[in-house]
Amino acid sequence: MADENSNLILKGLSKGDQIGGPTQLAKILCESIKSCKSFDKDDLTKRYLKWWQNDAFDTGPTYASVFSKIVMGTDPDEAVRQTHKEFDQNTAGCGPAHRCAPLAGFMNIPSTRLISIARQEALITHQHPDAGNGSALVVMICRLLLEGLSFQETLKNISNQPELKTILSRVKKAQLSPDGYILNVLFSAFYFIEEQTPMDKVFNFAGSPNYCPVIVGSIRACMKLKF
């Protein structure tokens, strides 16, 4: 069942991914979880590094900065801190939310651990808490949808969860925008999901950066919707 659900999310994610980087990183995440039988930050970091040193593309500037520093010998956590400082703390991107969604499909990992794991995974590259909380929000939405809730029921459930209700409230106040700020990416993705917007129109809105369609694809897959 874990393979079935994680593969379902991967398939949806890939349908929203016009470039390919998020799909490759999500596959690496799944490979690490399967190999370690759970989330292992050190193992995943090594796998992300190996990809960076070989076939990496479409990673985003934060990921690129962090792993460039690691290659030069910087401690991984220090590389994240340095990047956060060099970027004037502007590391609230959507990369973690893109790549981490399939985590929800590993039913052997309890729902009670998903938020913490998503935040830890985000910290491999993005220090800003919005990046981790946004990723955790996507993962929890996917898990609740897989458990049979509707999208609206899922949002209502999360609005009562102490660890996620604040980030969800902030997302609802964000903007419909094609930029990569995680709150705007999630606002836009939720808007298109609720409006049942065809993917071609979502792609047109997103433009070449293609930020929100990846989230739309992951969530729609968990809703068992046809693309």
Regions found by a protein language model. Give the residues of each.
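Structured, active/binding-site neighborhoods that engage oxygen-rich ligands
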Residues: M1-F227
